[in-house]
Amino acid sequence: MRKIHRLAAVASLAALTGVVGACSSSQAPATGGQASAPASESSAPSSETTTPSNAGGVTKTTDIFGPACNQVPKEGPGSAAGMVDSPVATAASNNPLLTTLTKAVIAANLGDTLNSAPALTVFAPADPAFQALEAQHPGILKELTTAPDVASPNSKLAKILTYHMVGKRYDAAGIVQAGELDSLEGAKIKIGGTAEAPTVNGAPVLCGNIPTKNATVFVIGQVLSLPPS
């Protein structure tokens, strides 16, 4: 599989159909791969966050938090304990709640790249986020995953996926403290809220601080829009 510069990752858990469905439609979609973003009451960065960051952004299963974490499988390879020793793409593929993300990673030929990356932070849209995107832009997922250049590092799908990834590990306190992150795609990702309830470009974190072997994963309720080029 082709390894691209911007390494990328996509990973883990939570199927939150109910959670995402309940909070997913107040932000206008962007063309080319965005679902509606749920409104969040804590969209602005907080200067009062006192939660300390974990060293190197590496978290433990006891650090996992969020309103949808109870949707993560309790046992097996797709559980929090099952994912911690697997590289991020493998961890995602083991979770039946991240099937759309996994298919996108495979189509973009990014699996080996993600698994071999030394350190990543991944903002992983759950299946309902992709369903919302498809509802707003019928046929978009097929268009992205079957494009002639889909396996190219410059394909639209690769750019969308790598926009959800950062080439360094951060925990929730770390991303909020940073306020803005450089994605592997190259564009900035804006972080708001607090360490207990962060937002990613305004989208809520549904389950965060999920550790895999080489990444810290945040399951989010929206497919992030690529900024205008």
Outline where the language-model segments fall.
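Mature, structured domains of secreted/extracytosolic soluble proteins
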Residues: 2-229
